[in-house]
Amino acid sequence: MPSPDSMTFEDIIVDFTQEEWALLDTSQRKLFQDVMLENISHLVSIGKQLCKSVVLSQLEQVEKLSTQRISLLQGREVGIKHQEIPFIQHIYQKGTSTISTMRSHTQEDPFLCNDLGEDFTQHIALTQNVITYMRTKHFVSKKFGKIFSDWLSFNQHKEIHTKCKSYGSHLFDYAFIQNSALRPHSVTHTREITLECRVCGKTFSKNSNLRRHEMIHTGEKPHGCHLCGKAFTHCSDLRKHERTHTGEKPYGCHLCGKAFSKSSNLRRHEMIHTREKAQICHLCGKAFTHCSDLRKHERTHLGDKPYGCLLCGKAFSKCSYLRQHERTHNGEKPYECHLCGKAFSHCSHLRQHERSHNGEKPHGCHLCGKAFTESSVLKRHERIHTGEKPYECHVCGKAFTESSDLRRHERTHTGEKPYECHLCGKAFNHSSVLRRHERTHTGEKPYECNICGKAFNRSYNFRLHRRVHTGEKPYVCPLCGKAFSKFFNLRQHERTHTKKAMNM
């Protein structure tokens, strides 16, 4: 290996064939360019005399091999001209002499790089200044507001747009900028591409973001579900919706394996494992993992119902409740069972129905082991063990385990019966009672036993019937331990103990 004193530029240069160059990725080509410039800079700094033709050939190699074949150093007009780049023009107008001719110049007649405004007495210094200039300049496409740190990246950007025939060379009105001027100049470009909404004045940096925002004003929903026809503003919302049809749950908990259709639901679920329940209700002390859940819960205490129906005026504490209610007006049932074709107005009702086909009961009580098809039913059941009744009537003080029971009870005070049968006009205080009544007109019996085929118009009667097959007797007498399949039968039995006690 040559010593540093005897080392020449020819000793350290690397030549690539076109085939070898094609095997390099963008980062490797950039690394080669940087190392090559470092080598030139180092040899110049230790006073080495460099041959102009070798240095310029090496500087040109990256461009030759990049398929654009733009020679900035020999003056060929392939894609771009020297006069378009002022500092290159000045350097090569002044630097065409041979090295021997350069040495014949006196101190009073140096080479002058007009663009840089500095005098050089040696071609080596001029070459070093070219390298420094290339390093401290940025290449800018004024049309697109893009800034590039090297000439190769700028040319790659230019090539992308020149492939499109609708763009002319006027798009590449570029300039060189000093590092010190980069920040204010880039701000100028940012201002040029600021996009403003004509309706509300909100500004955006990308045209795609502006178009998406404008759909809020226009109500445009270009992304439609091919299964139920429901439309959405954003394609991401459509993808989430499609999972309600397919049942896809791509977000799985790495601790328990439970899967979710939304990443936000997974994050909320993960808090159950970490027991992060920092959101505490100051009225009842109940804790929540998410502040939005706390706000929803607080509305049960305050009676706050900010979401009102435009058709009937009925108000709800949650936006999802309002959307579900609106379907009672328009009859929309977007969620269809792929096994029997039955349609539902809410996805939770569909999931609950599907479990009637497969018998799945994923939600188990940790106290008694009883399992349920819905988590809400499990929570309702757990209150039997705890005795919790969080929903209290502000008129009479009676408390209930469920908010729906409280609402139904409040109608006994107000006399409100908002659910009316469109066939006979009879009104009811609860939607479930209306649905049960409508079956007397239609003869519908949606609850069918999968063992004997008997059908029922009420879920309660269906549950009682199943106990005939299963032998289940959930109602146990605390005095003698005798069990019954119906609560009514337990009450009758308990009276026998009362009579015995009275006769003694």
Curated annotation (Swiss-Prot):
This is Zinc finger protein 596. It comes from the Eukaryota. SUPFAM superfamilies: beta-beta-alpha zinc fingers, KRAB domain (Kruppel-associated box). SMART domains: KRAB, ZnF_C2H2. Residues 7-78 form the KRAB domain. It is found in: Nucleus. A zinc finger (C2H2-type) spans 195-217, 223-245, 251-273, 279-301, 307-329, 335-357, 363-385, 391-413, 419-441, 447-469, 475-497. GO terms for molecular function: DNA-binding transcription factor activity, RNA polymerase II-specific; RNA polymerase II transcription regulatory region sequence-specific DNA binding; zinc ion binding. GO terms for biological process: regulation of transcription by RNA polymerase II. InterPro entries: KRAB, KRAB_dom_sf, Zinc_finger, Znf_C2H2_sf, Znf_C2H2_type. May be involved in transcriptional regulation. Keywords: DNA-binding, Metal-binding, Nucleus, Repeat, Transcription, Transcription regulation, Zinc, Zinc-finger. GO terms for cellular component: nucleus. It comes from Homo sapiens (Human). Belongs to the krueppel C2H2-type zinc-finger protein family.
